[in-house]
UniProtKB/Swiss-Prot annotation:
Belongs to the BOS1 family. CDD domains: SNARE_GS27. One of its GO terms (cellular component) is Golgi membrane. It is found in: Golgi apparatus membrane; Endoplasmic reticulum membrane. This is Protein transport protein BOS1. Keywords: Endoplasmic reticulum, ER-Golgi transport, Golgi apparatus, Membrane, Protein transport, Transmembrane, Transmembrane helix, Transport. InterPro entries: GOSR2/Membrin/Bos1. PANTHER family: GOLGI SNAP RECEPTOR COMPLEX MEMBER 2, VESICLE TRANSPORT V-SNARE PROTEIN VTI1-RELATED. The chain crosses the membrane at residues 206-226. The gene is BOS1. The keyword Protein biosynthesis does not apply. Residues 1-205 are cytoplasmic. It is a single-pass type IV membrane protein.
Amino acid sequence: MNAIHNHLVKQNASLKKDLSEFSANPAGAPMSLQGQISATMTSFSRTLDDYSEIINKEHNKEKKEKAEARLARFREELADARSEFKNLRSAREEKTLEENKTALFGDNPYGESRNRNVNRDVPIQPTYTDLTREEGMQREQSSLNQVGQQLDSFIEQGMAALGDLQEQSDILRSTGKKMRSVAETLGLSRETIKMVEKRARQDKRFFYGGIVFMLVCFYYILKWFS
């Protein structure tokens, strides 16, 4: 039990460290960090389930109560970590959306056209060509930035979906364990009932057999003395 408790302590410390790094810069944190946090939380949850099973098998009352208190504290910290991670992802998505809007509507494509309309009487063709090329490069760079931000947004959505699937997998895994436990309990009860019924039938046979043997004995005794 001490070994798995120490493992939980290490997982909890690693999770807090990653969340602290993510909270320091939600918008600029790499996607790999989010994946690492999701994986750590999933592993942490599974270790807690294993720890709970070990606690249920503990016969020492004092050790069991102490371990249950630790388990409750770890589960509470995991719930807080999930809530914090969700808030950080929401903050990152809002920041990304704001940057996309700024990149999309921040530049005014009519500014240069107005300047050229004001100076249309000036016959300087090279300047017009240079400005057009510069504007085209800016628009191309803006488009590339938008594509990159959209890709980041898609990756974030994929990571969020992966995290949700992992949480659902944990829930299904926990439910499956409970169902197996109930099935095992029912199976044991059925075996016990079958054994009791079998023993009852055997007792009935001995009882009725004893009655028949006693009647036969009475018959021969009466016949002998008569």
